[in-house]
A protein has these predicted regions:
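Active-site glycine/GP-rich loop and adjacent strand/helix microenvironment
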Residues: 2-174
């Protein structure tokens, strides 16, 4: 319903009849701080953040304000957002392997790196017909974790995004 929150009171009224939020961490953090300052209590079932890196202390601040767990999400406009999402273990994000093949490559050589090594996230989509993506270089810096997640899903685990890879002519800034 919302894009950028301009009226916190109106947004919080909407949350009283909601059970979750999906949004930008900065916007959700601003709502959490507004609630704390005005002693407003709203309990949700869960929060899904997207489109920006989120610090652990920000997660804790939001969880405290809304009395629920925060789940991080990795996605791109090009993939209709849904790339990978955290499970209840909160030890990384599981890629949607039925829809997306996710690789980590060395941005200099284009070769796949070992799990645990950082590189550029590259995706291939399986179900996009009009414009499939094949080894699409996202510009995001990340890594696949060596260890499987403790949850029961048998999916790879993408570590939290650690920045951007900038291309400048024949150089990369990592």
């Amino acid at each position: 319903k919302y894009g950028i929150v301009k009226n916190f009171d109106h947004a919080l009224e909407s949350l009283k009849i909601s059970d979750s939020i999906v949004g930008d961490p900065v916007q959700i953090q601003a709502l959490a701080r507004y609630m704390k300052f005005h002693n407003i209590n709203i309990k949700l079932k869960g929060i899904l953040t997207s489109s920006d890196f989120i610090l652990k202390k920000t997660v804790l601040e939001i969880e405290d304000a809304f009395q629920c767990k925060v789940y991080n999400h990795y996605g791109l406009t090009e993939t209709a957002y849904g790339g990978a999402v955290e499970c209840d273990c909160h030890s990384g994000m599981h890629p949607r392997e039925n829809d997306i093949y996710l690789e980590i490559i060395d941005p200099f050589t284009g070769k796949i790196v070992k799990d645990g090594d950082f590189g550029e996230i590259v995706i291939t989509t399986f179900n996009r017909e009009a414009m499939p993506l094949i080894r699409y270089k996202t510009g995001d810096r990340g890594r696949l974790l060596k260890k499987r997640c403790a949850c029961s899903m048998n999916l790879k685990c993408l570590d939290y995004i650690s920045g951007r890879i900038k291309r400048e002519k024949d150089r990369f800034n990592i």
